[in-house]
UniProtKB/Swiss-Prot annotation:
Catalysed transformations (reactions): L-lysyl-[protein] + 3 S-adenosyl-L-methionine = N(6),N(6),N(6)-trimethyl-L-lysyl-[protein] + 3 S-adenosyl-L-homocysteine + 3 H(+)
Cell location: Cytoplasm
Keyword presence, Methyltransferase: yes
E.C. numbers: 2.1.1.-
Keyword line: Cytoplasm, Methyltransferase, S-adenosyl-L-methionine, Transferase
Protein name per UniProt: Ribosomal protein L11 methyltransferase
Species annotation: Sodalis glossinidius (strain morsitans)
Gene that produces this protein: prmA
CDD domains, per database record: AdoMet_MTases
Length: 293
């Protein structure tokens, strides 16, 4: 059914209070959006960081008397009689179909394709990973995932063991197995990621080759020929002593989830233990790779 969208620009400090006001006025959902489209990266644990100028967006049933809603909001102390707003009518759509239409098979490197299950496989002779958007991060659409997939495609993984540190959907571990790895290990702090990785591995016929751990379950003597960690710059720096110990001597390390502006500080945390390659960039993100000394 159609909807009415009401957008009000406020400050990050006042966004929560205004959100409550929209909910009390009948909004069925309220979302926040940066007015200037500037992303926020790596909030502190337990923190929901907002932008300086924040759009508070309320969604109302089309039958709502929006004039009455506006009259009520004008009495709110944060707004007043002359507050600025924008109203938009949202047409009725098959949102599930539109969502599915946005996902297409994607190629990474020379051999590897990531394919949603509702699309035909472009090249049956290629290495095809069947993966649908779902419970956890990682479908290949984000530049950091793409950088890691391209790197894995360029390695000879036959007979190798691979660790996917921060496995999310399991996309990197599963891709490594489909590219010839003998065994993969996925580690993630989120139990939903473990569930998603297991489900995706079963869908791709590699579940018996993938071992999954929450951090507290991880064996202390865990090592691999290849380690890939697509998380964020802060955790990559903080967890460097742990991650450095995972690759075997002569093994390979791939790090992403890093903004290009953060590459130098992350590389410094690993430079003593690895012979590092030139940094690879995609859009504003980058990938750091190297060989264990």
């Amino acid at each position: 059914m159609p909807w009415i969208q009401l957008k009000i620009t406020t400050t990050g400090q006042q966004a929560d209070t205004l959100s409550d006001a929209l909910t009390e006025s009948g909004a069925v959902s309220v979302t926040f959006q940066d007015t200037h489209d500037v992303p926020v990266y790596e909030p502190l644990p337990g923190e929901t960081r907002l932008w300086g100028d924040t759009d508070v967006i309320g969604l109302y049933d089309a039958a709502t008397d929006i004039a009455t809603v506006l009259d009520v909001l004008k009495t709110h102390p944060l707004l007043g009689a002359d507050f600025t707003y924008k109203i938009e009518q949202l047409e009725d759509k098959d949102w599930e179909r539109e969502w599915m239409d946005n996902f297409h098979p994607m190629r990474f490197g020379e051999r590897l394709w990531i394919c949603p299950s509702w699309r035909p496989v472009p090249d049956p002779q290629a290495v095809n990973v069947m993966l649908d958007p779902g419970l956890a991060f990682g479908t290949g659409t984000h530049p950091t995932t793409a950088l890691c997939l391209q790197w894995l495609d360029g390695l000879d993984l036959r007979g190798k063991t691979v660790i996917d540190f921060g496995c999310g959907s399991g996309i990197l571990a599963i891709a490594a197995l489909k590219l010839g790895a003998a065994h993969a290990v996925g580690i993630d702090i989120d139990p939903q990621a473990i569930l998603a990785s297991r489900d995706n591995a079963q869908r791709n016929g590699v579940a018996e080759l993938l071992t999954l751990y929450l951090p507290q379950q991880q064996p202390q003597d865990l090592h691999a020929n290849v380690v890939v960690a697509n998380i964020l710059a802060g955790p990559l720096r903080e967890l460097a002593p742990l991650i450095i110990d995972l690759p075997l001597p002569g093994g390979y390390l791939g790090l992403s989830g890093i903004l290009a502006s953060q590459a130098e500080s992350v590389a410094q945390a690993y430079a003593a233990a690895f012979s590092l390659d030139p940094v690879a960039e995609k859009e504003e993100w980058c990938r750091i790779t190297g060989t264990r000394r």
